[in-house]
Amino acid sequence: MGQLERATVRPQTLIAVRDVKASSAWYQTLLGAHVHGADPDHPHRLIYDRLMSGESLVLQLHAWDEEEHPNLMGADRAPHGHGVLLWFEVDDFDAAVERVRRLGARVILEPHVNPAPQHREIWIEDPDGYVVVLASPDGEAR
């Protein structure tokens, strides 16, 4: 057998939310992200938004029950997000925790050190009930 060819993969995480505009503002504040595109008031931003860090895609937000995408219909029919963690590494953990406090986010686990990767984490809930983890870089807590 020959060596497997390595593919270039870029994660493009998308979550369904009830209010794209509100969720976009929440995540922009939490992550220090910005919206993709020149017109932040474009009408389609009520249905879909892309959050960026520099030129890198961080998270896509899509309204429930719009544009008839499978699995993005019927928000109330089934639980969503169970077993999914939206995990973000942040350069300045203390500043990220301050943003969490300013947002008034529900904290699931207060800041703590994860002993395996030796980094700090805070686990919170976003406005749609998704679990969000903010973590410092691995080894930062040594």
Sequence positions of predicted segments:
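Short beta->alpha connector loops
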Residues: 41-42, 92, 114-115
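Core segments of cupin and vicinal oxygen chelate
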Residues: 5-7, 14-59, 64
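Membrane-topology and secretion signals of cell-surface/extracellular proteins
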Residues: 56-69, 79, 83-85, 132-141
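Vicinal oxygen chelate
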Residues: 1-6, 10-19, 47-53, 72-142
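Active-site loop/turn elements of alpha/beta-hydrolase fold enzymes
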Residues: 66, 90, 112
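Generic structural signal for helix capping and beta-alpha/helix-loop junctions
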Residues: 43-45, 69, 117, 141
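A short alpha-helix capping/helix-coil boundary motif
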Residues: 2-4, 27, 74-78
